[in-house]
Each structure stands twice: as C-alpha cells, then as structure tokens.
Design a protein with these regions (language model features):
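Specific transmembrane alpha-helical segments of multi-pass solute transporters/efflux pumps
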Residues: 62-105, 147, 230-248
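Transmembrane alpha-helices of multi-pass small-molecule transport proteins
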Residues: 36-90, 117-121, 172-180, 194-212, ...
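C-terminal transmembrane-helix exit sites in multi-pass transporters
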Residues: 54, 114-139, 262-281
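Transmembrane alpha-helical core positions of polytopic small-molecule transporters
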Residues: 22-23, 83-92, 115, 149, ...
C-alpha cells in the first residue's frame, strides 16, 4: 500500500466516523425535538454558537495571533462568508427545517442527493467527468438510504413543496460544506477554518433564531444533550469531516456520509428495539458496498 492509498484509507475512516457521530447526535436531536419542542432554528443557533466558540478558543490557544490570519486578506471575506452560510449554516438549518415540513425519512433521502450535486459541480467547474462506476455506486447508495429511511414503505415519505425545497437546499449545503473550505484549510489550517466558519454561521443563525430566546425549560438532561450535540456532534464531527476531504475526494466523503442513517439504524436496533428484517439488511448492504467500492476505485486511481 503506497502513501496515497494510505491517505484514502484514513480519509474513508474519518468519513465513516463523522457519519457515525452525526447518526448518534441525530437520535439525540430527535429526542430533543420530541421532548422539549425546540425549533430547528434554535437548535442550529445553539450548536453552532457553542461549537464555534470552543473551536475558536482552542485555535487561539494553539496559534495565538495567527488565528486572525484568515481576516488579514480581504480577498477571503466573501468566499469565507459563502462557506459559513451556504455550507455550515445551510447543511444544519435546512435539514431540520425539512424534518419540520415533512419527516426525518424524507429529509434524510433529500439530503443524500448531495453526491449528485458534487458530480455536477465537478463537471461544470473542473470539467471532470465522473466514471460510470462512480455514478452507479452513488445511485446504489441513494437507493440504500431510501430503503433504510422508508423501510421499503414509500408512503412514509411526505414530499410537500416546502419539504422538497428545504431538502434540496440541505443537499446543496452538504456540497458547499465539503468543497468551499478546502482552500482555507490548506492555507490556514483546519481548526481556525472550522472555528471561524461556525462562529459566522452561528451569528447568522442567531439573527433568525436567537439562542437566548428559550421556548422550553432548561434541566440537567437538556443541558447535557445540548453540550453533546454542540461539542461532539458538531465541533468534532465537522473537524474530522474536513480532515477526510483533505485525504479523499468530496464525492467519496459525501457517499460515505450515508453511514449517518446506517449508524442511526444500528443504534435503534441496539437500544430502541428496532427489528432487523430483510429490508434493513438489504439497505445496509446497498449503503456499505458502494462505500467500499468507491474508496477502492479511488485507491486504484492513486497508484
């Protein structure tokens, strides 16, 4: 195994780990919505503000005044703002908004259209044509996500116009979130890039849904869930997701992000009594196999 292939293996592992973390926190988020009736805007503001503050403080402790380097070049202002709003904010906010307008199954399926957007982006911007096998793996993984989210019952989908729009915006947010930050991460480092991105996204989100306007009563469990979602499911997950994109292509990362509904299903089997049937096993296979084959294909291309 050469150096490039080792990078692809590491990138695949990072991608899987970020998906697993998001799956865990997705279950916590659903519990939070159900038991505390919080809005999608509030939970987005909370997690981005807390996570961004933590990452930026950590970055300042490590880099001192260099943490401000991003802002010393005025050419960075507009592209970085685009990353914060079109990427970080959109992928969080529009997913939860889609859940509110429809349900979790519909939101999950629509968000996983992101690999298709990345294929189009690569074609339009880089004139890079995807291989037939890559397109096939993306479609198979999408089928697996659809089967897992609906359990084979398409009547569970709630495809209202608002759900379709917010779901597609969430998918575009995934695309921007894995593509736009890369120049900044390479030049200034992953930690300050993620930290500043979350702070800006959090400020924007607070304009829409101020985090200080509570619609529920804080207790020990709600505080604990907020901290886990913010620090573990947002700061840490975003960081390793960006690290993954530095090692493998954005397309591979977006396909491997299907491990999020996979991890949610596995946790539901272990802790919530979800019954394992043939539709669930088939969905798992349709999700896992494209991840493996797409990573192997990229490893072969790096030889």
């Amino acid at each position: 195994m050469n150096q490039y292939q080792k990078k692809i293996v590491k990138g695949t592992i990072y991608s899987l780990l970020s998906g697993l973390i998001w799956g865990i926190c997705g279950i916590l988020g659903e519990y939070f919505f159900t038991h505390y009736q919080v809005s999608s805007g509030w939970i987005t503001s909370m997690r981005l503000t807390l996570a961004g503050s933590l990452v930026l403080i950590w970055s300042a402790m490590q880099l001192k005044s260099q943490v401000l380097d991003i802002w010393r070049d005025k050419k960075n202002y507009l592209p970085f703002l685009a990353y914060a709003i079109l990427g970080i904010f959109s992928v969080q906010y529009f997913f939860y908004l889609c859940v509110e307008y429809s349900n979790a199954a519909t939101a999950t399926i629509l968000q996983f259209i992101s690999p298709v957007f990345i294929l189009f982006y690569n074609r339009l911007v880089y004139q890079k044509r995807a291989s037939k096998s890559a397109i096939f793996y993306v479609l198979v993984a999408m089928l697996g996500v659809c089967l897992m989210a609906t359990k084979g019952d398409l009547s569970q989908l709630s495809m209202t116009p608002l759900a379709l729009v917010t779901g597609l915006l969430s998918a575009m947010g995934v695309m921007f979130n894995v593509i736009l930050p890369q120049p900044f991460a390479k030049r200034y480092g992953f930690v300050p890039t993620v930290g500043w991105g979350m702070i800006l996204a959090g400020l924007f989100s607070n304009v829409l849904s101020p985090v200080y306007q509570l619609s529920f009563t804080l207790d020990i469990w709600s505080i604990l869930i907020c901290l886990i979602i913010a620090f573990f499911g947002t700061a840490f997950a975003f960081f390793i997701s960006m690290k993954a994109v530095s090692l493998v292509s954005p397309l591979v990362v977006s396909v491997i992000s299907a491990s999020e509904p996979l991890s949610s299903a596995l946790l539901s089997v272990l802790f919530l009594g979800l019954v394992v049937d043939w539709s669930l096993l088939t969905a798992m296979a349709l999700i896992i196999l494209p991840m493996i084959f797409l990573s192997v294909e990229e490893a072969k291309e790096s030889k």
